[in-house]
Amino acid sequence: MAAAAAAGEARRVLVYGGRGALGSRCVQAFRARNWWVASVDVVENEEASASIIVKMTDSFTEQADQVTAEVGKLLGEEKVDAILCVAGGWAGGNAKSKSLFKNCDLMWKQSIWTSTISSHLATKHLKEGGLLTLAGAKAALDGTPGMIGYGMAKGAVHQLCQSLAGKNSGMPPGAAAIAVLPVTLDTPMNRKSMPEADFSSWTPLEFLVETFHDWITGKNRPSSGSLIQVVTTEGRTELTPAYF
């Protein structure tokens, strides 16, 4: 009974990237459960309980300090049950591409900056036993010659996740850092850019939202440092840990 009651209580969640396709779904789903949900993004999410607007800048320290200060002001001494970093994006290009530097810069900003800031926020504002999720990529478990910046950025996120699970990482006691490694998410933007693709191999956003819900409430939560591959085949999605 106690576990069932705990699973039903109102939670507090911070969604980093709360106006993206997956982030918006997370905000909607958790608000519908009467959870308190804060969105952190470059634009406001009006459906969230609170929104923090990230200022665009070419300085990582500037952006990190701004977000850290504003989240600190918003939360005060209150702790959150989960920080879901679902920010990210995609850009292609090999090492010879004219757009290599520009695309690498974009990937680092969208994936590494956001994941690093989320990790620091977790050390300050996550409850003991809380959850931090990071957005990795299955493709980055191997070389990604056609998308150099993307692969580097996601590879760094995987490494960060494993570091956070180690001793003296700064994470709260009992808290877990878990990276999800999808192949392709079924978003409106992806459908628009790849209209001929096999959508039955794309992961529905709802699947990840429900997975996050389970992990937040302690159901089937993998151990900290896990890199969880999210693979959809013919409309069926499975979660499989990546081992090295």
Curated annotation (Swiss-Prot):
UniProt record, GO biological process: amino acid metabolic process; dihydrobiopterin metabolic process; L-phenylalanine catabolic process; tetrahydrobiopterin biosynthetic process
Annotated SUPFAM superfamilies: NAD(P)-binding Rossmann-fold domains
The keyword Nucleotidyltransferase is assigned to this record: no
Top-level taxon of origin: Eukaryota
Residue numbers of N6-succinyllysine PTMs: K73, K79, K96, K102
GO molecular function, one term: NADPH binding
Record text on subunit structure and interactions: Homodimer.
Family to which this protein belongs: Belongs to the short-chain dehydrogenases/reductases (SDR) family.
Functional summary from the UniProt entry: Catalyzes the conversion of quinonoid dihydrobiopterin into tetrahydrobiopterin.
Name assigned to this protein: Dihydropteridine reductase
Origin species: Homo sapiens (Human)
